[in-house]
Amino acid sequence: SGGQTLIPTLKARLGMPTSLVDLSGIAEMSGITSNGDSVTIGGAVTHHAVNTSSDVPPALAALAGGIGDPAVRHRGTIGGSVANNDPSACYPSACLGLGATIHASGGDIAADDFFQGMFDTALGEGQIVTGVTFPVPAKANYQKFVQPASRFALVGVFVSQMADGYVRVAVTGASESGVFRWTDAENALASDFSADAVPAAPRADGMISDLHGSAAYRAHLVA
């Protein structure tokens, strides 16, 4: 899972798994279905397929279209990205930002419970992500500042508003703890769903600081 992370790791000999299993041939994990209120995407569906499907909400489709390059988008899958939970991956922010349900081989897991830190999830040993169900929002948008070489998010923010007015804001690429919900922004946007209502940048404490940007810089980009 997470080939955009896994392949560079293998090339650098930072990881040496004894076995690699290809899940792309499992037909039950390869479809996209919609019932109007939600859309379910199989774990083996590629980023390209998500990007080009008319059943996928526009914000999620646009997110998928901005992942990696064409080679990555035609091979990489939503299930692999979600299971890998790279701290700079885009899909985790959509899962949290839309209140998705992760379908695993061991059962269903709410996105709020699934992502537990950098490269850490609620998946049990030997479990895989078989699909993800996303509620269809009334409004949503995803914006990211891109690391030019990898196309990962230096910082990415997914914002949604449901038909009942409920707002979720999720941030990827910024925190040492991985993807997180920005509750201050959620509370502000719940009262006034406009750019003017977005609060000042979150605290830089706990933000990633590396060669791509300091913690303070990432906090600034979030807002």
Report each predicted region and the residues it spans.
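C-terminal structural segment of proteins
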Residues: S1-A223
